[in-house]
């Protein structure tokens, strides 16, 4: 059993902790929290709580939450840390991981050079085998890589144009916006294009990102110029081989991200998460060598399976197909069309 520590127990960290706990080849040995809030109180019923350093202990003690020790203490026990701290903190934490000889996974908010390789389970699993420091790419980049990889394998990819309509913030964050505005990223391509190249090779891609006042999901409008001609049925068949992609249909009442997230609730998933990338089947248009489609990305959870697979790759516990199968089975990910 690989002993996993979680540094940062926010949107991603708490979901990774639950996912790791669902595996039969790894275990959570502790989580790091900075505040004795309601999240810490609930988490303490299930996980050992650690703090960044001793200066945080009194606040937890005053709140009646037991603290096992500091991050340094957790690193004495953990073989690997999943660093889900806020953007930029992973780079600052890395020297401690190196000092304690612990492997580490970083999330997409960190720069690529924080790790030996960036990671997506479908597109470059093998690059992470045996590595000590791996970065799981962002929710948006994961969403693009998930659906572009099958197209690349089936038809080849010449060029990708993607418009990313991004949610403003996560549902539990009341401090960010916009609230009543549309906020474009004026840098073109947005950072997602070079990020995609870290897991899909030197793919020719351009991305535009626009932030809108919603918290549910991101939506991507994607156009792909392919090397081989494609048909609608051929594209759908290519995606059918991958469980982490689902097809949804307007005719079944799924017109918006609201219905997609309601569908996730009906799955009975932990936190109503949708690990899969949802593609509106009616949006798929393949004419000669151009494929167009629209997809929705649940930004809180689509990277969670990748974190589990990255752990297996780094410890060479399983090959790509076996790891993905184990992760999907444990999280209830199965091929679905709605």
Curated annotation (Swiss-Prot):
It is found in: Cytoplasm. InterPro entries: DapB_N, GlycerAld/Erythrose_P_DH, GlycerAld_3-P_DH_AS, GlycerAld_3-P_DH_cat, GlycerAld_3-P_DH_NAD(P)-bd, Glyceraldehyde-3-P_DH_2_arc, NAD(P)-bd_dom_sf. Coiled coil: none annotated. Keywords: Cytoplasm, Glycolysis, NAD, NADP, Oxidoreductase. The keyword Cell division does not apply. GO terms for molecular function: 4-hydroxy-tetrahydrodipicolinate reductase; glyceraldehyde-3-phosphate dehydrogenase (NAD+) (phosphorylating) activity; glyceraldehyde-3-phosphate dehydrogenase (NADP+) (phosphorylating) activity; NAD binding; NADP binding. It catalyses: D-glyceraldehyde 3-phosphate + phosphate + NADP(+) = (2R)-3-phospho-glyceroyl phosphate + NADPH + H(+); D-glyceraldehyde 3-phosphate + phosphate + NAD(+) = (2R)-3-phospho-glyceroyl phosphate + NADH + H(+). Its EC number is 1.2.1.59. Pathway: Carbohydrate degradation; glycolysis; pyruvate from D-glyceraldehyde 3-phosphate: step 1/5. SUPFAM superfamilies: Glyceraldehyde-3-phosphate dehydrogenase-like, C-terminal domain, NAD(P)-binding Rossmann-fold domains. The keyword Oxidoreductase applies. It comes from the Archaea. One of its GO terms (cellular component) is cytoplasm. Belongs to the glyceraldehyde-3-phosphate dehydrogenase family. This is Glyceraldehyde-3-phosphate dehydrogenase. The gene is gap.
